[in-house]
């Protein structure tokens, strides 16, 4: 399968501070990669590298031709005094045709919001509008920076359901950044745990194995949410230095 984007041993420094060290990953059509990590781990920098906004100091980046990327930012800052409907907000995107706006909103089950004020939207509604905006250029790769931030668990289930539907319909790759270190989208193909370098990687454990979780959030939640169990051979001290766990050596 041809990669959309691949990073090989990428490192990024800002001044004397090493933010990313020897990071490798591969984004493929129809596959979901979820990136986890604590605050300050370099997740946002890695996203900017994938988007082509940051040039690494070391390593190799390969992109598939004129790659179309749809991006959903972590936060949206709007002037609350500026009257702005969803329709007008989406038309601010360069190259957008007005006849494409309603179909994009309907695709994310948000057609009814077309004339709603942006400032009045809930967290989940805002994420759907931003996702519709990302779909306007028919992306081959969706980059979602903490798409479930500020959304409750039921909203997360609905968003994950929608993301899974879109990746199947579009056969697009998905890079998803998560602020939750353990609860991830169950249908993620690969999870990477980042703390300036790749600490560990693997697949999520589907929560359908946990009856207590099913009783709390229902079978639909169990289908869309998964637990990722970390398997680090080290920890990081307060200065960010690697401290190997007992029984492991640096080799």
Swiss-Prot record:
Keywords: ATP-binding, Cell inner membrane, Cell membrane, Ion transport, Membrane, Nucleotide-binding, Translocase, Transport, Zinc, Zinc transport. Transmembrane segments: none annotated. One of its GO terms (cellular component) is plasma membrane. It is a peripheral membrane protein. It comes from the Bacteria. The keyword Protein transport does not apply. One of its GO terms (biological process) is response to zinc ion. Its EC number is 7.2.2.20. It is an enzyme of class 7 (translocase). Part of the ABC transporter complex ZnuABC involved in zinc import. Responsible for energy coupling to the transport system. This is Zinc import ATP-binding protein ZnuC. The gene is znuC.
